[in-house]
Regions:
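ABC ATPase NBD coupling module
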Residues: 69-83, 91, 113-121
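Conserved ABC nucleotide-binding domain
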Residues: 130-146
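Conserved ABC transporter NBD signature motif
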Residues: 61-69, 131, 143
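Q-loop/switch helix immediately C-terminal to the Walker
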Residues: 96-112
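The feature captures the beta-strand-to-loop junction immediately N-terminal to the Walker
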Residues: 38-40
């Protein structure tokens, strides 16, 4: 479960350009629930996601995942539990790595790792099957850098 409790977020606080984005904002998303966030440009959709992921700090309130308070956690710590798809695809990939390496990295997110191989050869066909329905030919370009 994801909960936002009493979130307060201001841009440029204490200046003539101060803008209140969220004031006592609350949201609860239960496990397995599918949610669409809809709004006009500048309404705070992306900012809300950035707040949840830790890219933007809040002035007040709590962010809870399964009852655990992550409000003060660093972004990299939250990323162990939160996955996201960026509006700019380049933000969620490593351009010096291949499609296969990027998929493997995402597949292993949150798992323990060592100094072994980064790509599990047993998962390559699985990744191809994930890419095939996109009809972009990416399944044949798995070893091409992003």
């Amino acid at each position: 479960m994801l909960e936002l409790k009493g979130i307060h977020k201001y841009y440029n606080p204490g200046t003539v350009n101060e803008m209140c984005l969220f004031q006592n904002f609350n949201l609860t998303i239960d496990k397995g629930e599918f949610v669409s966030v809809v709004g006009s440009n500048g309404s705070g959709k992306t900012s809300m996601l950035n707040i949840i992921c830790g890219s933007i700090p809040v002035e007040g309130g709590q962010i809870l995942i399964n009852g655990s308070d992550i409000t003060k956690q660093k972004e990299y710590k939250r990323n162990q539990r939160i996955g996201r798809v960026y509006q700019n695809p380049a933000m969620g990939t490593c351009p010096t790595m291949t499609i296969l390496e990027n998929m493997s990295l995402a597949d292993n997110k949150g798992k323990r790792f060592g100094l072994g191989r980064g790509v599990n050869k047993h998962r390559v066909e699985y990744y191809r099957e994930l890419l095939r329905p996109l009809n972009l030919g990416l399944e044949d370009k798995m070893h091409v850098k992003v």
